[in-house]
Amino acid sequence: MATLLSPFSPSPLAKVSQIIDSTSSPSFSLFPLGRQNACSRKADHHHHHRIRTSKFGNFLELTPESVPEFLDFDLPWFHPSDRIRYDVIIIGTGPAGLRLAEQVSSRHSVKVCCVDPSPLSTWPNNYGVWVDEFEDIGLVDCLDKTWPMTCVFINDHKTKYLDRPYGRVSRNILKTKLLENCVSNGVKFHKAKVWHVNHQEFESSIVCDDGNEIKASLIVDASGFASSFVEYDKPRNHGYQIAHGILAEVESHPFDLDKMVLMDWRDSHLGNEPYLRASNLKLPTFLYAMPFDSNLVFLEETSLVSRPVLSYKEVKSRMAARLRHMGIRVKRVIEDEKCLIPMGGPLPVIPQSVMAIGGTSGLIHPATGYMVARTMALAPALADAIAECLGSTRMIRGRPLHQKVWNGLWPIDRRCNREFYSFGMETLLKLDLKGTRRFFDAFFDLNPYYWHGFLSSRLSLAELAGLSLSLFGHASNSSRLDIVTKCPVPLVKMMGNLALETI
């Protein structure tokens, strides 16, 4: 869902998405919303022309006005003549890469180099988070817009009002803060694309497109979902979240300015679109909306999860029909984004010679698409594991280092919890619009401790089991029938995977 949005300066024109790895690969997600490498701002004139038709409304024909921006910041650059051997090389300067660089470089003088084709580019995606998540990790000052409440439209007759504040991340403020801390800690930067990663027993190196080779004890891949540097030994049977979003100036809109719309599952806008309505009944999409003022709003039509992925053209067509039905006339498209987020699937091989964080590490929430806040929160623990090996006099390297850092990110309890979240994703994949509505009707009736914890990946395995029992108790009879008839296969798969993890 698009919890996922995009980087602006701290002006009201910023949006929030949850892909958090490489600068050049945007993404976004609803349960943050937070998505990566999958979401991108589009200004391709040919793309818009290709799908243009008056049936879908004028906004699809409007060209986004945003252009790539760069931070005005002096970085300390890597110089080949220095012949420095680093402790850690981090590939990618998205939120995940810079957060880890900031954290690990502050521990025991660990030497870090970040490599990215454009380290000063503003992040091209938006990030949305629950305010309490950023409060817990000391980053609340990086939010430039907050809403005291969120709401979920189950259908035309039922709306859930959630007393949990939601915020939009200022991409420029967050990136500047991370860069400032990195520079203070002695992190070096290299402007290049990594072509190859090579490994020896106690040392690794990267080869860049400018011909430079840089050596380190540990390589960390934070470059996003599309990376080829991280190995998998199981089929990557992802579900996919796909969305189309626009930051738009509109003549007016119907949203309350003090409420962020987390999900709108209504489908009355498809009454005159029989094909779209029929397909939406099987593979539903919802609207995600962040109203900034009476004329500025971020709007995103999102397929929560599907396999195979829902057509992007279909998503845009549904969005156009929805906005037309709601009477929202778009005057200007300031940004638009296409978001495609792989969800669930197997974890990378653990351990392996390349460490990972962000989209390529499996951190994205399999059932929601959230990732940014979680990555920000987990980076310090991973930094501790790295520093324990490389910042001490012991200098643990090679396979013991890889084992230590991978287990620092994915300890057994976290891997087991992920199996449960993946079970949630597999369940959602089997629900049509009516089943999805029933599910979220019951889900947001749970004790806030449960639904807060589920969306923020905070619950233990025992608590997740308690959530399941409570959800079954809150569910309607029809929803219970969905659970009984559609969940056994995913449940058996989850139990088998849990058994394998604990052996």
From Swiss-Prot:
Location of this chain's protein in the cell: Plastid, Chromoplast
MF terms (GO), sorted A to Z: capsanthin synthase activity; capsorubin synthase activity; oxidoreductase activity, acting on paired donors, with incorporation or reduction of molecular oxygen
Keywords on record: Carotenoid biosynthesis, Chromoplast, Isomerase, NAD, Oxidoreductase, Plastid, Transit peptide
Catalytic reactions on record: all-trans-violaxanthin = all-trans-capsorubin; all-trans-antheraxanthin = all-trans-capsanthin
Pathway involvement of the protein, from the record: Carotenoid biosynthesis; capsanthin biosynthesis; capsanthin from antheraxanthin: step 1/1; Carotenoid biosynthesis; capsorubin biosynthesis; capsorubin from violaxanthin: step 1/1
Name of the protein in question: Capsanthin/capsorubin synthase, chromoplastic
Membrane spanning stretches: none
InterPro entries xrefs: FAD/NAD-bd_sf, Lycopene_cyclase_b/e
Family assignment from sequence similarity: Belongs to the lycopene cyclase family.
Top EC group: isomerase
EC number: 5.3.99.8
The keyword Electron transport is assigned to this record: no
Source organism of the structure: Citrus sinensis
Record-level GO BP terms: carotenoid biosynthetic process
Tree of life domain: Eukaryota
Alphabetical list of NCBIfam families matching this protein: carotene-cycl
Any one cellular-component term (Gene Ontology): chromoplast
Biological function: Catalyzes the conversion of the ubiquitous 5,6-epoxycarotenoids, antheraxanthin and violaxanthin, into capsanthin and capsorubin, respectively.
Binding locations of NAD(+): 88-117
Isomerase listed as a keyword: yes
PANTHER family associated with the record: CAPSANTHIN_CAPSORUBIN SYNTHASE, CHROMOPLAST PROTEIN, PTHR39757
